[in-house]
Amino acid sequence: MGVLGGDAHVPIGSQVSPGSVVVTNNESFGHRKLLKGVDFLVRIKAFAFCLAVIVLLKNNVQTTVIAPGIVLQAKYNNTKAPVSLLVLASICCGYAFLQAVVSLLSFIRDKRVLNNTVLAWLTFLLDQVLTYLLLGSAAATAEAAYIAKRGEDKVQWKAVCGPFKRFCDHFAATVFLSFIAVIAFAVSAAISAYYLFRKSKGFK
């Protein structure tokens, strides 16, 4: 004979201390739904920020006449760092979108889509690798933006943001969004690590 609380079964005569909390299946269900909802929101935000980085970089062009007959043009591909960021942001954008779809399906069905250990490890590793690669690329682009803004006296590089203010402003916005995307990917990586831990312990 026992006492039923939700879906939990607590035998009569068992010792439960006043501070104890019995976790029911309903509470576990709510926790899973919340985590899957957060996972979807974070991944869709990562997709949106990476897409914004791509759009800003591709459309960031400014042409300036500095003297009669002398026209200069500033583009993202004038240096290597933004080019690398564009390529990596494109990869991360596609990956984040696919993972967001998988996460949404998992949330709707209350069941992990593609739920096996190999894919859990693959998701964990890809999240980790892309997070660090995006962080490195964003940092390199931030350095390029700083040099464009301030110059570098040691190697006699002059600041170029005087005649290209709009270009530099958009460039700075791109760097900012890149780091926000890194944060979103880092949170996604933490969630996938948690899923992998639960998988290794035999949980759903």
UniProtKB/Swiss-Prot annotation:
Top-level taxon of the source organism: Eukaryota
**Glycoprotein as UniProt keyword:** yes
**Where's it found, cell-wise?**
Cell membrane
Q: How does it sit in the membrane?
A: Multi-pass membrane protein
Annotated glycosylation sites: N77
Cytoplasmic side, ranges:
1-36, 106-117, 192-204
Stretches of the chain found on the membrane's Extracellular side: 58-84, 139-170
Keywords of this entry: Cell membrane, Glycoprotein, Membrane, Transmembrane, Transmembrane helix
Q: Name one GO cellular component term.
A: plasma membrane
Record-annotated membrane-spanning stretches = 37-57, 85-105, 118-138, 171-191
Q: How does it assemble?
A: Homodimer and heterodimers.
PANTHER family the record matches: CASP-LIKE PROTEIN 2C1-RELATED (PTHR33573:SF30), CASP-LIKE PROTEIN 4A4 (PTHR33573)
**Similarity annotation:** Belongs to the Casparian strip membrane proteins (CASP) family.
- Name the NCBIfam families on file: A_tha_TIGR01569
Q: What is this protein called?
A: CASP-like protein 2U2
Q: What is the lineage of its organism?
A: Eukaryota, Viridiplantae, Streptophyta, Embryophyta, Tracheophyta
